[in-house]
Amino acid sequence: MGTSRYQGIEAYVGRTPLVRLRRLSELTGCEILGKAEFMNPGGSVKDRAALGIITEAEASGRLQSGATIIEGTAGNTGIGLALIGHARGYRVLIVIPDNQSPEKITLLRTLGAEVMTVPEAPYKHPANYNRVAQRLAEEKGWVWANQFDNTANRLAHYSTTVPEIWKQTISSCGRKDYSWDCLRALTWEARCVWPGNAAPARPL
């Protein structure tokens, strides 16, 4: 069978447009832009994190065919993991507090995830949904996404979000009225755009 011109769902994560926020721009006298992350397949910026976490786990060998991905989440990271993990053939188990809406739980299941609800508990409590996910991963040998401490989460933005914003705004950065703002905003991003760059001698 020939190669299809269509791609899997993960190919459509990112490359979201910048939208001018007209009223805020007029109120402040600045050009204020919003990155339309709701246009990702799962409807949020967390699709980038999910794709980055899964891709890094595959590259490291921790995530292999037939593996289970588990995460404790009450937010959109679970949706991203369900969407991308299921598309790549993994079992995805989301541990979620029982005070979340039935609609969110239904959506997770519709996207292919299994859902375990647990009573709400403080973050550091052993019964907290994130701690339950960690414990089950250790006991069962599953892959814990660990979004809060997983550097692949942040690196997903270094490798995708930052270059996108740079490309989408570079045409404006040459203008005199934009140059200083662009310099301040992009100083920390330079490590991604030009990985060999050193940090500035002093903060801007």
Predicted regions and their residues:
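PLP-dependent amino-acid enzyme catalytic core
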Residues: 1-204
